[in-house]
Amino acid sequence: MSFFRYLSDISSETRTLLLAYGVLGGLYLILVPLALYWWMNRRWYIMGKIERLFVYGLVFLFFPGLILLSPFLNMRLKGQGET
């Protein structure tokens, strides 16, 4: 039985529900953590206290997605340069 035949046997409500779960899962596990990585990398040295607290809260909220993406991203902060 092919995948498309199996998919055609599923009701439209179930397909809509699966699509909604897929979109929300993609947002939670990939899209928002990527945006959070980008934001932290861009603003790390110029964040204020409130912004840093907000970003740490988002890191706590989207931790599973950040862990999934961490092996593929190298976001090391700038060091002191050569000593």
Swiss-Prot record:
Chain segments annotated as transmembrane: 17-37, 53-73
GO cellular component, one term: organellar chromatophore thylakoid membrane
EC number(s) recorded for this UniProt protein: 7.1.1.-
Keyword Hydrolase: no
Transcription regulation is among the record's keywords: no
Alphabetized UniProt keyword annotations: Membrane, NAD, NADP, Organellar chromatophore, Plastid, Plastoquinone, Quinone, Thylakoid, Translocase, Transmembrane, Transmembrane helix
Reaction catalysis annotation: a plastoquinone + NADH + (n+1) H(+)(in) = a plastoquinol + NAD(+) + n H(+)(out); a plastoquinone + NADPH + (n+1) H(+)(in) = a plastoquinol + NADP(+) + n H(+)(out)
Membrane topology: Multi-pass membrane protein
A molecular function GO annotation: quinone binding
Compartment(s) where it occurs, according to its Swiss-Prot or TrEMBL record: Plastid, Organellar chromatophore thylakoid membrane
Signal peptide span: none
Role description: NDH-1 shuttles electrons from an unknown electron donor, via FMN and iron-sulfur (Fe-S) centers, to quinones in the respiratory and/or the photosynthetic chain. The immediate electron acceptor for the enzyme in this species is believed to be plastoquinone. Couples the redox reaction to proton translocation, and thus conserves the redox energy in a proton gradient.
Family designation: Belongs to the complex I NdhL subunit family.
Record's subunit section: NDH-1 can be composed of about 15 different subunits; different subcomplexes with different compositions have been identified which probably have different functions.
HAMAP family named in the record: NDH1_NDH1L
Protein name (record): NAD(P)H-quinone oxidoreductase subunit L, organellar chromatophore
Organism: Paulinella chromatophora
Gene designation per UniProt: ndhL
